[in-house]
């Protein structure tokens, strides 16, 4: 049985290096791996000894914490209906732009994100009790990247407007949902933190069964937003938008004169509980574990308008291409705006974990009972890699 357990854990630890996958599980035996310190010797006494003090029971560890999520499995968390203008029904020509909101099927409902990445570099500190329990925290910086179909971001615009003017009316609302495009965003590097606890619950020889619980938070701002759409392609550096604002947006939305906007930021929260089994083989301690986690990314459903000119230049305010192929702008004529997408905007919808369960595989290398390096990979609910290097005082 021992040989079988050794074989399974060693194979899992070595195979993890070939496939990488925001919170690590960690080695369940970590509280008891480093039993000596670089400044103070470890205490191996009996906790039930009446002569033992808390000074003998407590120790500190510090080190580097790196967590790199290459693909988090996320989906949108939105309502089934979305308020915008009626669908166009005219078979030819243009039509009067809608001015009232209608409840339509939300194209963002249940959408899966194509890519979600997060990279964290931090310092970690752990308070150890009786070489069995850890209470730890991390302080560092995180950055992220999100990519998805434009429908996930409710990219909308107005098409077929029959007005005789260089801009739409103030009460016009979008009537087209653009779902054949891609939206991606990059965040800046922002402060992040996490707290947690880990315990070695059961030990038998060299095997250890342990559990942990963690919580993490960060709130990075959106550094760059790219909309890759044939009908309305644009890029915004440090985008700003409207929170809690229904259609229609002000006509100055997207211009330098826009007011009432705020910076786009993403509030990231995650909690995780895990259970893992390890087996010590001299200086190597491979482990395998399962985890249950929930993550959310909330941007307050901020709506961001396409950048445009405050005043018309050559009778246009954006560089959106013609769609039906008119080829020119007919000034002072009906339908001069009908062949281009107008009042384009998108919103950053709330996202959450699409899968709650995952597995983690890793190994820890211990040197002189004072230093340790842990390498871990996580799969199923995310593809991530974790590196942890620490020492005991």
Curated annotation (Swiss-Prot):
Q: Which domain of life is it from?
A: Bacteria
Annotated signal sequence range:
1-22
Ion transport found in the keyword field = yes
GO MF entry, a single one: structural molecule activity
Indicate yes or no for the key word tRNA-binding. no
Its GO biological process terms? monoatomic ion transport; regulation of cell shape
Question: What keywords does the record list, in alphabetical order?
Answer: Cell outer membrane, Cell shape, Disulfide bond, Ion transport, Membrane, Porin, Signal, Transmembrane, Transmembrane beta strand, Transport
Record's Gene Ontology CC terms?
Answer: cell outer membrane; pore complex
| Pfam families membership | Chlam_OMP
Location in the cell reads: Cell outer membrane
- What's its membrane topology? Multi-pass membrane protein
Which InterPro entries is this protein grouped with?
A: Major_OMP_Chlamydia
Subunit organization: Part of a disulfide cross-linked outer membrane complex (COMC) composed of the major outer membrane porin (MOMP), the small cysteine-rich protein (OmcA) and the large cysteine-rich periplasmic protein (OmcB).
Role description: In elementary bodies (EBs, the infectious stage, which is able to survive outside the host cell) provides the structural integrity of the outer envelope through disulfide cross-links with the small cysteine-rich protein and the large cysteine-rich periplasmic protein. It has been described in publications as the Sarkosyl-insoluble COMC (Chlamydia outer membrane complex), and serves as the functional equivalent of peptidoglycan.
Which family is this protein grouped under? Belongs to the chlamydial porin (CP) (TC 1.B.2) family.
Q: What is this protein called?
A: Major outer membrane porin, serovar E
């Amino acid at each position: 049985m021992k040989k079988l357990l050794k074989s399974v854990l060693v194979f899992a630890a070595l195979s993890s290096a070939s496939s990488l996958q925001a919170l690590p599980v960690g080695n369940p035996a970590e509280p008891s791996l480093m039993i000596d310190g670089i400044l103070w010797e470890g205490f191996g006494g009996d906790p039930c000894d009446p002569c033992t003090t808390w000074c003998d029971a407590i120790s500190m560890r510090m080190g580097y914490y790196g967590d790199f999520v290459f693909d988090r499995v996320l989906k949108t968390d939105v309502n089934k209906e979305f308020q915008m203008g009626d669908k166009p029904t005219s078979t030819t020509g243009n039509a009067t732009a809608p001015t009232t909101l209608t409840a339509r099927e939300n194209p963002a409902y249940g959408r899966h994100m194509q890519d979600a990445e997060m990279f964290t570099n931090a310092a970690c500190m752990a308070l150890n009790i009786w070489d069995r329990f850890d209470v730890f925290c991390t302080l560092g910086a995180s950055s992220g990247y999100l990519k998805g179909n434009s429908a996930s971001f409710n990219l909308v615009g107005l098409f077929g407007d029959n007005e005789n003017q260089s801009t739409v009316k103030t009460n016009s609302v979008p009537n087209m949902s653009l779902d054949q495009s891609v939206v991606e965003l990059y965040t800046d590097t922002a402060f992040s933190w996490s707290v947690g606890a880990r315990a070695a619950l059961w030990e038998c020889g060299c095997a250890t069964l342990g559990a942990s619980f963690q919580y993490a938070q960060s709130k990075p701002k959106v550094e760059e937003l790219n909309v890759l759409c044939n009908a309305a392609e644009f890029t915004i550096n440090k985008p700003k938008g409207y929170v809690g604002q229904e259609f229609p947006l002000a006509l100055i939305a997207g211009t330098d004169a826009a007011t009432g906007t705020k910076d786009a930021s993403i509030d990231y929260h995650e909690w995780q509980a895990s259970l893992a089994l390890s087996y010590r083989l001299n200086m190597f301690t491979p482990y395998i574990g399962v985890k249950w986690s929930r993550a959310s990314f909330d941007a307050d459903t901020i709506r961001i308008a396409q950048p445009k000119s405050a005043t018309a230049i050559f009778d246009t305010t954006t560089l959106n291409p013609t769609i039906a192929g008119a080829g020119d702008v007919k000034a002072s004529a009906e339908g001069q705006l009908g062949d281009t997408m107008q009042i384009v905007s998108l919103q950053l919808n709330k996202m959450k974990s699409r899968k709650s369960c995952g597995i983690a595989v890793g190994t820890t290398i211990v040197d002189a009972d004072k230093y340790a390096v842990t390498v871990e990979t996580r799969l199923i609910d995310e593809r991530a890699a974790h590196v942890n290097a620490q020492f005991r005082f």
